[in-house]
Amino acid sequence: MTEKLAPGAPPSADFIPLIVPELRGNEWKYVKDCLDTNWVSSVGSYVDRFERTTAERAGTKFAVATVNGTAALHIALLLAGVQPEDEVLVSTLTFIAPANAIRYVGAWPVFIDAEPKHLQMDPARAAEFLEQDCRWDGTELRNRHTGRRIKAILPVHILGHPVDLDPIMELASRYSLQVIEDATEGLGARYKGRNLGSVGHVGCFSFNGNKIITTGGGGMLVTDNAEWASRARYLTTQAKDDPIEYVHNAVGYNYRLTNLLAAMGCAQMEQLNEFIEAKRRIATLYRESLADLPGVRAPEEAEWAFSTFWMYTPLIDEKQSGIDSRRLLRELNANKIQARPLWQPMHRSRAHDASGSPSCPIADVVHRQAISLPSSVGLGPASQSHVIEVIASFLKKEN
């Protein structure tokens, strides 16, 4: 019987986790400083420093820390002027957070399929939908099927690789749309030399425990728009209008990151380059070692991209390999190697209405074939070689 392995389970001598944090820098020192000085809540020098260093890393003028990446997405949608009953184009092949954030503001997601080579939102499918399924009157763009206004595009950079953003930005310019980059899996990745989060009108990062750097839980909104940054700070601090009196003239949110967690983030940010190097080294060993196995397709890096390979996720072609991804997943977990499928595409989720969306056949295929392999920054060569050996042995046995 296959042992059930909990997400985020700690590593042990005979267990290889999917992704765990790497806390080996100044985390203890900075957190202790917060405790020693009693600066543990939502203001403090580490919050300021974490925002500053994230903005520098993203290549934007401003950054606003939030409690998580979903909160950053929620605020970004509000800044972009997305209203109830509007529609937002969003990647279908993604974790559910961006679709949920769209619903938080009363708007509706329109799911766009992935392109088959890099598994990111397909700009061609987005353009096809806007040109064929929408009506543009020179000032507003509306979905012909629902009658709703299209307000924004929310491309999600999945697995550490960028979406092809130039065509997305061109569509946004043509139809007066806002672009919200979901870079929650893309910190440190680059598109044509530009850091993710800096290409669209606003970008969002996540510092969840499985991300390339972590605060345990946290997020960040980045932008070059001073007015938006000021508004984000206002909304994330319960929309408080007076520094002394408790006066509120708008609905706000308790979304600010604590100084304690920001201290962790500062320490982690100091190690980001090292972490990216480790992720890319892990990806290279997987790619080279699995290259000759039938039906195993490695993730590809576009010539215009710099990927962090945050989560190494090959595709398993059942016809060529003789097995499907779920059988391989069970075999790995039976050998105490934590592997996971990718997310159910959002157009298949019963939580969201996809009736106004185009078809998404590529995402359906990717969902069936994808399997995420152990990708922790601290994954050693011996452990990774064991993962590779289990995969190779299982494919050989089944063929």
What are the language-model segments listed below?
Residues 1-41, 374:
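N-terminal "arm"/small-domain region of PLP-dependent enzymes with the aminotransferase-like
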Residues 94-99:
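Conserved coil-to-alpha-helix start sites within the AMP-binding
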Residues 46-52, 60-61, 124, 135-148, ...:
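PLP-dependent aminotransferase class I/II
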Residues 40-87, 101-103, 111-113, 135-144, ...:
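Phosphate-binding glycine-rich loop
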Residues 106:
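Structured binding elements
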Residues 117-215, 220-222, 227:
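Active-site phosphate-binding strand-loop segment of PLP-dependent enzymes
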